[in-house]
Every structure is written in structure tokens, then in C-alpha cells.
Amino acid sequence: MVKIKPFAGIRPPKELAAEVSSRPYDVLNSQEAKAEATERSLLHIIKPEIDFDPIADEHDEKVYKKAVENFKKWRDNKWLVQDGEEHYYIYAQTMNGRTQYGLAMCCYYEDYWSGKIKKHELTRIEKEEDRMKHVELQQANLEPVFFAYPDNDEINKIVADYVKNNKADYDFTAAPEGFGHHFWVIRDKKINDRITEIFAGIPALYVADGHHRTAAAARVGKKRQESNPNHTGNEEYCYFLAVTFPASQLRIIDYNRVVKDLNGMTTEQFLKALEKNFTVEPKGKEIYHPSKLHNFSLYLDGQWYSLTAKPGTYDDNDPIGVLDVTVLSNLVLDQLLDIKDLRTSKRIDFVGGIRGLEELKKRVDSGEMKAAFALYPVSMQQLIDIADTGNIMPPKTTWFEPKLRSGVVIHTFDEK
């Protein structure tokens, strides 16, 4: 059963919420961040390399130092202000007319090590350590991780009633995506206490997005424990910031692939080779979207094709083997195109479905890439099944949208 707690969040005044909050550090590069950052944007804190001209190496010591300076400046200028009491917070997001309702909370670092916070991706040590360094220097979780939890009717009712009966503290539409962000401070102590009690009966949380931030936060907690002879387990550094959503409200969108070449084959040879494991149907020049699991779109030489994996080419009882990313990797990328390692190969790139299949067409038509594959999205249930069985998804399998804004609320464990 998971352990959570409310916290005294650091957050912008209402009139600055849209300007201070920003997209997460890992969805835009330094040049994009520099162009997007206004004077008070959190990007100056989470991507502080943009404050140097020319843009500095993000791992340079002066960059980490600048992040600390900027966080202090934002607080000194009252662009970020700490709440006087501990709360849970409702953070809702609207995309394409659909709203999902999360709870901003502090999660317990030991739940990560004990497996109650379940992951589905591998992490890279160097990325963990970069995030760790920021957390340790700031003594804060500046950016939340994105978790899912098994649906709970009482939590759903608490959130729905609070939203209905209380005006949002923030309510804004964020550029450049145009998604709505809505935020309530839960100021009723009885409700906050009840949320803690209910989550104590929830068996697990699932990392949806933010595996490196989660690992980094858990490592910081463990490191602080080991260096504190008087550690009790109740210290603020034992907790880290997450926004946690009911699993049924989340949607994973497609995460597609583009390849540079056909491994020496002509178009005709490649299409013929595909017929061994797929039913191949030409679809013409109109964009074709995969219609169901095990159905893929192929864009090649100005034409779209439907590829449907034949029965027997995947195992319905294998939570990893049944994934379309695995089917495509095994039967096409590996067998036909000799692309063995998706993490290191320079012959493949990945395109989040938020960009649409038009982006795949553009990458191929420009001559940059030879072919594109669009996949049917993974379901939340597939993600949960994989995490529950201790398996790891292949690289670049899940893309969640909308992303959480960074700086809507921050958790600090600075106990000075």
C-alpha cells in the first residue's frame, strides 16, 4: 500500500501562473527553450543553459549554479511563493475537449525501492545523475513526475465535488499547444486527511512519464538517509512531487518510426518481403491511420499501405511480445532492415503521435527518411500489465499527452 502526503507547495501567484509555468525540460531543446522563455519562465531554472550566450553545455558546473541562483531570484521576486500550510492540489488538463483530473501529492521514496511505484522503462544512469544534481542543489522537486493509479470511486467523487464547488486557483490555456490547465488548492483538512487514508489502501502507483526524475528523486532520498544518522523516515527529503491520475482517464498516443533506408532492398523487394508476416494492402496517397492492434501504416515512395500482422506472428500471452512495437521491431526492423538496437542505431528515428502522420509523410517526402511506420497506440492496461509483471517496454513505446506543466506547483525539502 502506498504512502503519500500533502505538502506546502511553492507556486506562482494566480496572475503569473501561465507565464511562470513551462513545458517540461525534456520536450524541448536548448534553442527552443531560449526562444520560448519569457522573463519569468521556469525554463530559466530547469534549462538554465539558456541564460548564457552562446548557450552553455547543460552539464557545465556554471549551469547548475545558475539554476540555483535563478530559483532564489524567482522566490525573492515573489514570482514563486510557498503556501503556508500543507495541501493536496487538483491539477486538471484539457486536450481536444477532454479533461483528465490528477492529484498533486508527495510520494514516498521507499515505495520506489520496494516496487510499489512500478516502472515500465529502463533509465540511463547519466540522465538520472543529471536530474539528481538539480534536485540536490535546489533541495526541491521543480518538475512533477506523472503517475497513474488504479481507479478509485471515492477519490473520483472527492475530486469531482471539489471542482464543482470551488473556483479554480489557476485556469489558463498554455502556448504553444493550446491545452487547458486548471488547478485547485484543496484547503479542507478533512478532505486532505481522507485522501491520505484512501491512498494507503491503493496497492501501487505506475510511472506514466518521468522515469528519470522518479529514479533521481528516489536516489536523493536514499542518499540523504544514508548521510543522516538521525534519519526517521519522516523527513521531507523522503518525499517527491508527483501528479497522479486515475488510469482510466489517461490516453497513450502513438509513437511512430521513420527509417533512413531499406537495407539495400528496392521498394518492390521490401513489399514482397513484408508479405511473409503481414497482409499488405495498398491505400493510395491519402494518409492511412492504423485501425486496430497489430495493424500498421507504412508510408513509402509517396504511397500508404496497411500492414496487418498474420496470426501466429505474435504471442497473445506474452505481455511484451504482443506489443506492436515488438512485432514491428522483430519482424521488420530487425529481420528485414537489420536495425538491431533502437537506442543506438542512427538509421531510425521516432516521432511522437502528437505531431500527426503528416509529420511522417513530411520526413519521407523531404528525402531525409526512406519509409515511415505508424503504430496503433499502446493501452493503459497493457502498460499496467507489463509493470505488474516486472517487465520493461521496448524503447519509445509510450507517448502521453498533454504533458504536465512544470512550475504549476513545486515541492521543496529545504529544512533550513
Question: Model-predicted segments: where are they?
Answer:
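Surface-exposed, charge/polar-rich loops and edge strands
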Residues: 1-416
